[in-house]
């Protein structure tokens, strides 16, 4: 297994797919990395020479913000929104959707499990 940006990448996958295991690199960014380094994207990661691996590491290190740095930046951006008291920051704090989605019926992923109502419990008959 090759290790790039602190992530073990699977040798049996194509380079384009293996690079997406790194946080911050998706399909389009993986293709861009392959084009910029001149390494064919259909080549499997296990078939790469040590020179090609070093070339990949250098390119990713110098040009793309990945893993810990990217996660830290996202967290700091959210913290900044909360600190300055924006509406988006408030939504993050309350655990509700941030981008304007409706919450009357949906947003279960963000809000968590549904809470039962007291009105639906059967009343005791005399």
Swiss-Prot record:
Comp. bias regions, Basic residues: 107-126
InterPro entries (UniProt xref): Rbsml_uS13_C, Ribosomal_uS13, Ribosomal_uS13-like_H2TH, Ribosomal_uS13_bac-type, Ribosomal_uS13_CS
Keyword Calcium set for record: no
GO MF term set: rRNA binding; structural constituent of ribosome; tRNA binding
Alphabetic keyword roster: Ribonucleoprotein, Ribosomal protein, RNA-binding, rRNA-binding, tRNA-binding
Superkingdom per UniProt: Bacteria
UniProt GO BP: translation
Annotated GO CC locations: cytosol; small ribosomal subunit
Keyword flag Ribosomal protein: yes
Pfam families, A to Z: Ribosomal_S13 (PF00416)
Region of interest (Disordered), residue spans: 96-126
Function: Located at the top of the head of the 30S subunit, it contacts several helices of the 16S rRNA. In the 70S ribosome it contacts the 23S rRNA (bridge B1a) and protein L5 of the 50S subunit (bridge B1b), connecting the 2 subunits; these bridges are implicated in subunit movement. Contacts the tRNAs in the A and P-sites.
Subunit structure: Part of the 30S ribosomal subunit. Forms a loose heterodimer with protein S19. Forms two bridges to the 50S subunit in the 70S ribosome.
UniProt xrefs under PANTHER family: 30S RIBOSOMAL PROTEIN S13/40S RIBOSOMAL PROTEIN S18, SMALL RIBOSOMAL SUBUNIT PROTEIN US13M
Family of the protein in this entry: Belongs to the universal ribosomal protein uS13 family.
The name this protein goes by in its record: Small ribosomal subunit protein uS13
Species this protein is from: Hydrogenobaculum sp. (strain Y04AAS1)
